[in-house]
Amino acid sequence: PGGSDGIFVFSAAAAGLAVGACVTVTGTAKEFNGLTELDKPTITPKADCAPVLPTALTTLPVSDADKEQYEGMLVAPQGTYTITNNYALNQFGQVGLAVGDQPLYQATDVVAPGAAAAEYEAENLKKYITLDDGSSWDYMRNTTAQGSPLPYLSQEEPMRTGSQVTFAKPVILDYRFQWNYQPTGQIVGATDADDPLTTENDREATPPAVGGNLKLAAFNVLNYFTELGEDEDEFKNCPYYADREGDPVTTNFCEVRGAWTDAAFEDQKAKLMSAVNGLGSSVVALMEIENSAGVTWVDRDRDYTLREFVDSLNAAGGHWAYVPSPVVTPATEDVIRTAFIYNPDLVRPVDTSYIQMDSAFANARYPLAQRWQAPKSSTQFVTVANHFKSKSSGDDDGTGQGLSNPSREAQAHALTSWTSQMWPAKPIFLMGDFNAYSKETPVSIIESAGFTELEKKYEPTSATYQFSGRLGSLDHVFANQSALSLVTGAGVWDINADESIAMQYSRRNYNVTDFYTTSQFASSDHDPVVVGLQVRVPSQK
């Protein structure tokens, strides 16, 4: 009682056995990286035996000790699971699952940093298990694996985080680096007979309905660079990430950060054109678009790539203009920047744009502000595009909010102080990638200055980003009290963060299955945030 009735047999001879074959196995049990197995066994065929029936798992065992009672056994997981991690699907054929009808969220997107966040994450861990593909293949490095279709994934079954699954077939509970459900055979492609899952396709064809007669959007476009890696390579060495045939696709820590070849750039562009034109927005704040003046090996003005972006959008059926950079710009800047594009039929810029050249943003992107007015409307409002310091480098303040959190706090203070001084009586929207989850201190600083975070107000469980099997919002739109009276709704268009990275242009031809399409899905790694506004026009009473 309390012991497992199954065990993994480590033997080359086992490869010739079919599921359901009867054998007698003798050997020495041992532990290998946490997995109990029989080593150097003797395997003898047997005439008959009792059938192996799966043991129902009505709930996922929580502790290691509880799971070990079922280790190596055929089990039938019951109820609903939700995909919460698909990042390793592209490399190891693995899907992270959470028990229940919700994915797992970043703790600091839900509760305050510190003890509450630690407690929240401890509960996350109790709900998590990986579904493996029945193999140890590395689809990024193993050439045989690259020539075999990725398991589980297709356009029809995109295996998005947040989508719900149930188990239609039994699996084996085992331990390899972490606790896993293993199918009873290797999964090859999306329609393998041993695939144990029933899945759903919950892709959203259109943005959320947010009402109003104007729409704002904030969108990180994932390093959109017209300057290519192959061009930089003519001036200085520019390493690249290659597909399965060794052909370059994207840059690898070069000065430019996007596509390496023109073909890859066209793939990237087509997806972004579908996404941005599909937003139907009046004003879009862009993050991670090339700052052409910051590329040292070409002589471009700051707006060169922004103009190209707008020209491409219009060639694809859009109707856009861009906000030119102001005359005075920072002396030194990052090679990526923020920008505004807009539909000139719906809204017009008032005066020039402004860049907040505060030293707090020296390690990030300087905020870009623009005042707007709709034709025939007396209402003016201000939007500020932001891209705070990332979590990937800098000092750790020990609060569990990622690296460089003090920098983001200083940026939040500087931003709110500047905007309140510049436009004390105007509706103000702070938009963009703040690199801070919804309960982290930079967000709290902005809210304490009188701003309301809109997507959580209207969609409390929304998320714009996926990292390490957890969902959360790094991208936000904040409204001050005056702006809040204009807002009719807000939401996240879930087209990117939930998608497998295999669907992105940057992974094209990494596998024999071509997952690339020109659709909006996986056009970036961040989801756009959309906000509806109602501004008065003369016909309204």
Language model features with spans:
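Metal-dependent phosphoester-hydrolase catalytic domains
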Residues: Y152-E157, T161-K169, L173-Y181, I187-R203, ...
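N-terminal, active-site-proximal structural segment of metallo-dependent hydrolase catalytic domains
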Residues: A190-T338, A374, D396-T416, A497-F521, ...
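Solvent-exposed loop/turn segments at secondary-structure junctions
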Residues: A14-G16, K30-N33, T44-P45, T82, ...
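Extended non-catalytic accessory segments flanking core domains
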Residues: P1-V249, Q356-Y366, R408, H413, ...
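Sec-exported extracytoplasmic/periplasmic mature domains
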Residues: V25-G34, K40-D48, T80, T84, ...
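Extracytoplasmic/secreted proteins, especially bacterial periplasmic and envelope-associated proteins
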Residues: C22-T24, L74, Q78, P170, ...
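Structural recognition of the beta-strand scaffold that forms the well-ordered cores
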Residues: F8-V9, V25, E37, V75-P77, ...
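Active-site His/acidic residue clusters
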Residues: T379, A385-N405
